[in-house]
Design a protein with these regions (language model features):
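Serine-hydrolase catalytic machinery in alpha/beta-hydrolase-like enzymes
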Residues: 69-153, 157, 161, 165
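Alpha/beta-hydrolase fold nucleophile elbow
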Residues: 167-178, 199
């Protein structure tokens, strides 16, 4: 009997060892679980006119499940990197500075696209006339100039979806962009300014296409007597032209700080009755580091706070 038990135990031990090895192999293959942000979800959305697929990354406030109130909603370009930054800063400003809570909606790049390829195409207002660009996706030429079409996708499909599925206060919509993302914001500001009630635009690439947005601003002023919008511009103080270089409207020789001052000044000269702009230069920041500061001050310029 004891031999039988010993034989069984040996077999059972062998089976357990085999199972342990298999479990170890599976764990090694899958790796540790990824980190998830609380109260977030992802929605797929088809841009029908563009024939492309995107995702919306949605962060809900901590109090969302507790009542029936509606919340201001932030729409964030370049969400693949900006969404967690915006979500966490907005949450921290609420918890520690008394800022009202918000819903955050991140706008992803197109599915299957390299991020740079997607943002070049969807966020820029025109095809560059004087500068050639290399492809960033194998087998696909560079694409530019579809900001107007992408903006229509936002207003006709994304905004209605958010209004249907979430308790968003659609009278308090905020667009958040940086760099090319700010070009998209300017495209919408100068075509359908009421798409959003507030624009937070960091380090806009006003050098793009030899300063085409300056032309768009001038054309808008020639056709309109008002620009109903609230805009917060922010930029890093280090986003200036290097000493000894001659300023031009090209990526290599742009003085982005002076470009933004000039653009904001042009808007102000028209004295639009319902336009409110602010411009802030963050002196120790550059193009890569300035976004969190722009976001923080841009939110504070629009949202209410109890402290």
């Amino acid at each position: 009997m004891s031999g039988t038990v010993n034989t069984f135990s040996a077999r059972a031990g062998g089976m357990l060892l085999a199972l342990a090895c298999l479990a170890g192999s599976a764990a090694a293959a899958t790796g540790p679980a990824g980190y998830a942000l609380d109260n977030t979800e992802v929605r797929d959305i088809r841009a029908r006119a563009l024939q492309r697929d995107y995702q919306l990354y949605v962060a809900l406030p901590d109090s969302y499940r507790d009542g029936a109130r509606r919340y201001p909603v932030l729409f964030v370009a370049d969400a693949n990197y900006a969404f967690p930054v915006v979500r966490n800063i907005a949450q921290r400003l609420h918890k520690h500075a008394g800022m009202e809570e918000v819903i955050v909606v991140g706008l992803s790049y197109a599915k299957g696209d390299n991020g740079m390829h997607s943002r070049r195409r969807d966020y820029t207002p025109s095809v560059p006339r004087k500068q050639a660009y290399s492809a960033v996706m194998p087998g696909r030429p560079p694409e530019f100039g579809q900001a107007a079409a992408y903006g229509k996708f936002l207003t006709s499909e994304v905004l209605p979806l958010v209004a249907r599925h979430y308790r968003a206060d659609m009278r308090r919509k905020v667009f958040v962009g940086h760099s090319y993302g700010s070009l998209l914001g300017l495209e919408m500001l100068l075509s359908e300014p009421r798409s959003f009630e507030h624009y937070i635009l960091g380090s806009p690439s006003l050098w793009f296409d030899a300063g085409v947005m300056f032309e768009r601003e001038k054309a808008y002023a020639g056709r309109h007597r008002d620009l109903p919008a609230s805009v917060f511009f922010g930029i890093g103080g280090l986003e200036r032209l290097a000493p000894g270089k001659k300023r031009s409207r090209s990526e290599e020789d742009a003085d982005m700080v002076e470009d933004l001052r000039e653009f904001d000044g042009a808007l102000r000269t028209h004295r639009y009755p319902h336009l409110k702009t602010q411009l802030r230069v963050f002196h120790e920041e550059d193009h890569a580091s300035v976004f969190p500061s722009v976001l923080t001050h841009g939110l504070r310029s629009y949202l209410s706070s109890s402290k």
